C-alpha cells in the first residue's frame, strides 16, 4: 500500500512545481522598466538619450512616463500574450519628445501584445509583429 502512494506523492509534488513555475512567469513583469528602443521590429529606433521613458507593471495595471507625459492602463496576461485595455495619458506637448511619445503610446495601444523576456530585456511586440517596444529592467 505504501509503494502505491509514493508515485502519487511524487506526481502531486511535480504538478505543484510545474503550476508554481507557470504562475511565477507572469510576475517577472513586476517592477519598473526603462525604454531601450521602439518602432519597426526590423530596425527599432533607439530611445532618446536623457529622456526618462519608463513603464511599471503591477498586478494587472501599468503606468509610466514617455518624456513629458504620463500614461497608464490595465492588462491581463495569458502565457506570452498581453491583452491591454484602454491606455490613458496626459496631453502636454513637448516638441523634443513628441515623436517618441506618440510612437510608444501607439504601439502600447495595440490591444494584443506578444511578450518576450530575455535576461533584463523585455520585448513587447504588436499583435502583427511589425512594431516593438524594448525595455530594460531598472
Where are these predicted regions, by residue range?
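N-terminal secretory signal peptides that target proteins for export/translocation
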Residues: 1-3
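Lipid interaction determinants
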Residues: 6-7, 11, 16, 20-138
